[in-house]
Amino acid sequence: MVVIRLARGGAKKRPFYNMVVTDSRNRRDGRFVERIGFYNPVASGNAEALRVSVDRLAYWQSNGAQLSPTVARLVKQHAAQQAA
């Protein structure tokens, strides 16, 4: 099954997450098909905290990819952010 989930990067105590499309059997930070965005939970000031390629997200969802609960929450947050 293809899933869209977060892969952790960054340094110790400074997490940075890539939003990736991958096979559910792959490891969290392992091989992925495509990177469609990122989430930086420690962004400060004018730094961009969340970016999602909405067209690629829609493409993968139309091909049957499932969102992880965290990614679903972030996508909803991104949509509200774009509307405001």
Curated annotation (Swiss-Prot):
Taxonomy, superkingdom: Bacteria
Entry keywords, A to Z: Ribonucleoprotein, Ribosomal protein
Pfam families on file: Ribosomal_S16
Protein name: Small ribosomal subunit protein bS16
Keyword Cell cycle: no
Similarity annotation: Belongs to the bacterial ribosomal protein bS16 family.
Molecular functions per Gene Ontology: structural constituent of ribosome
GO CC terms in record: cytoplasm; small ribosomal subunit
One GO-annotated biological process of the protein: translation
Annotated PROSITE patterns: RIBOSOMAL_S16
Coiled coil: none
Species in which this protein is naturally found: Dechloromonas aromatica (strain RCB)
